[in-house]
Every structure is written in C-alpha cells, then in structure tokens.
C-alpha cells in the first residue's frame, strides 16, 4: 500500500535512493545521523519515549510488540486463529510481547496511524526501524569520532519489538548490504 513504510531495503539502497532524489530535486537529501535521529525522536523529552518511560502505555502512540502478536498463532490451509487449548498454541505464541497493551495492529501500518510526537513526527518508535547514516561505534559518542565500523545503525524498533528494544536510545547494528524485514528509512 502506498501509505505503508518501505521495508527490506539495505542501507546502501536507502543512500542510493537519497542520492538519486537529491540529483532529481537539486536538494541535499540524505539519512539522518544517529544523533539527529535521536534528537528528533525524543522531541525534547529525556525519557525512554517522547511520552514517558519504558512502562508507559504505548497503545495509542506506537506500533510495538503487544497482544496482537498472538494473532500470529494460526493453522490450516486457510489460516484460522488457533485456539488456546490447541497443544501447539504455545509454540506459535513464543514472540516476546507486552500482553497488557493492544495497539490494534499486527504488522507495520501507514505513518499516521498513531499520534505524532511534539515535533510532528510519526512512528519514531516501532512500526519499522530506520537506517541512520552513522557507523555502529561506542555509544554515546562524539560526532567527530575517528572510530569506524563495518556496521550501520538502525534506530526506533519495529512492530515486532518490545519497548526496551524501541526506546529512544536503543540501537541495532546491521551490515550496509542487509535487507532487513523490519527496517526502512526516513530522509532529511
């Protein structure tokens, strides 16, 4: 769907898209650095999330791993929800989740499905993680660091992550050529 975030693109793909869009528009378009991404995500907050700490109810704010992940438990040729009494149920509900929260969505959704942060940005936590143009080096770090890494940083977590893996400070490292199932990008 057009309103869905792009996923399964590598860092290299994202940077190439930014390069071509810059060329076409005459504007300098790129990915944010990790520091720029975190500043935009926090939107003036010093908490784990722009709306509170790790235990805040994210149901109306973000698309994270919640009780809707139980909907992955299906069976049959025409997949139907699996009854909790089914002996196989426990093997299909292994994904870690916050069962006390229901954000209403199982997988990634359009950008404006949840509330925007105070800067007007949507889905900074959850939905899909986002590439930054920063190398995965010691954190926190100085932007002028000489340290480098073969990995690039993705921030924000996704619909499959619990809050502790989607907080403002949470980072994930991937090779620049990796096309990760739950990672997309945001341009600046």
Question: Which role fits each region the language model picked out?
Answer:
Residues 181-188:
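Short, structured beta-strand segments at or near domain termini in extracellular proteins/domains
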Residues 1-170, 181:
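Functional-site microenvironments in short loops/helix caps that host divalent-cation chemistry
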């Amino acid at each position: 769907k057009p309103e869905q975030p792009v996923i399964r693109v590598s860092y290299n793909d994202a940077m190439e898209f930014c390069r071509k869009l810059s060329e076409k528009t005459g504007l300098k378009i790129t990915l944010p650095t990790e520091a720029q991404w975190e500043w935009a995500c926090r939107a003036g907050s010093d908490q784990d999330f722009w709306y509170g700490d790790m235990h805040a109810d994210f149901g109306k704010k973000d698309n994270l791993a919640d009780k809707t992940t139980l909907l992955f438990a299906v069976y049959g040729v025409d997949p139907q929800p699996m009854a909790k009494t089914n002996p196989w149920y426990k093997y299909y509900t292994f994904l870690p989740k916050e069962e006390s929260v229901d954000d209403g969505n199982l997988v990634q959704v359009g950008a404006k499905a949840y509330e925007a942060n105070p800067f007007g940005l949507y889905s900074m936590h959850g939905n899909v993680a986002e590439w930054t143009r920063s190398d995965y080096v010691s954190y926190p770090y100085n932007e002028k660091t000489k340290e480098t890494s073969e990995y690039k940083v993705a921030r924000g977590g996704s619909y499959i992550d619990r809050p502790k893996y989607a907080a403002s400070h949470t980072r994930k490292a991937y090779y620049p050529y990796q096309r990760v199932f739950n990672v997309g990008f945001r341009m600046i």
